[in-house]
Amino acid sequence: MMRPIPAGLLILVFLVFPSGAGGAAEAPPDSLVARIAAAGDSASFPGEDLVLVLDVTRVDVEESGLGHVRHRTLTKVLTEAGARALATRRFDYDPASNLIRIDTVRIHREDGTTEAVDPSTAIDLPAPAHLIYWGARMKLLSLPRLRVGDAVEIATYKKGFQIAYLADETEGPDERYVPPMRGHFYDVVLFQDDLPIVEKRYRLRVPRDKPVQYSVYNGPVSGSLRFAGDSLLYAWHALDVPAFEREPRTPDRTDLAPKVVLATVEDWPEKSRWFFEVNEPVFEADGAIRRKVEELLRGVEDEEEKMAILLHWVAQEIRYSGISMGEGEGYTLHPGIMTFHDRCGVCKDIAGMLVTMLRVAGFTTYPVMTMAGSRVERIPADQFNHCVVAVEREDGSFTMLDPTWAPFNRATWSRWEGEQHYVIGTADGEDLTAIRSFAPEESRMRIDGHARLDAAGDLHGTMTLTGKGISDGRLRSALADAPAWDRTGAVARLLEPLGAGVEVLDLEAVEPRDFSRDAQL
């Protein structure tokens, strides 16, 4: 099943912002007054409610790789709808691995006055959660009544990281915020948003012995590099960027919006070796796991069948539910023993369970970083949101398995995941590669029907639907998601596009968990 891109996964973000305190109202700098006036009004941006007048991010990176980010935005209200949209500001963070501080909030009124908002009035609350319950939090700050022509200035400070699959080996008061791949920094910076941007800048300072490699994608972004004593200063900016337009079936914004991808890591094999080393200890098995593997594979000789049996057991028996295990959650693969006992986890834990069981069965297996929903660029920055499994074969090739997307799907690799980029974590190091593309025929739905039209105009007949690939999963899910007593009703709802009033009189269907043959009903 496709999971929302945040889900349990491999994204690493380093952020940090400046300290400051809300104080008495003061006149804004002339440059801000001029920027707000020059930004224009609703006539300048037809159909838009807000415009991002200025977006500046400054990042200072330590030797450890810890990034300190200072972020400042200036957003102008163009319509009453925009005023309502800005009424409450939300700031997300994970207290286990990062922090955020709201330093300055000012409202620049249309009449030229400035109103300061006390950041300490923000309310700290648990963030809404669905399927992943790791203790994320948010700060909500309500603003005074806004009017068309007003502009909101916000400055924040944030540091830390958000990443899955890593072991926690850090100590000390600030060590919790140091990225797990210690000594390295990477980021993906988008230069387009859901609202138009007048000016966006991103400035990065790194130690001189930690040069950053980067590339610009999907549009013009100007950049520069300067030497500054013991530091390297990188800067990128974009001007007059239109709002990102979403359409039905639009690819992920990171595939279309102008962006800079940057990293101090040399190449993907280096990232692969690190990923292998930090995760290798979690794949140990205990007696209970060994007995279950023996039970499942008793009498089975074919290697492909063994892999499929273990894949589907993990897919069906380990529920997708991220329960916090305490310190280190969100960036640590759960040990296989823990997942087997809990019978739940997110994609990283489900993949780890399959790696553990396949190793018990004698297969050489590794965890894999991948990105479901968008491409991964050649620059070795973390661009992952999902974890899967690789089985190394005798000829050195790999067979890819994804237990998270396998529930009620016969295929051992979802046909939704064609051309998906991935990096396998091995001791020798692997490069970035991609899954092959899948032809439409691999997900074909075959429909055989025999029907007659009676004198009243009703159509009576029999229909046989046989699905492969994506269509196989569609049929199985329609059956599995319905109570056993209502499967005829579920099939009737599946057939509703054929015409109103479809009635299923009799049904013979595949058992949804029978993966020995294509789904048929």
List the model feature ranges, each with a label.
Residues 7-19:
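Bacterial N-terminal signal peptides
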Residues 7, 344, 460:
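Short glycine-rich loop/turn motifs that provide flexible caps or phosphate-binding loops at active sites
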Residues 302, 306, 346-350, 459:
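Short, contiguous, pocket-lining structural segments
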Residues 14-15, 300, 354:
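Hydrophobic alpha-helical elements and their junctions with loops/disorder across both membrane
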Residues 1-5:
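Positively charged n-region of N-terminal signal peptides that target proteins for export
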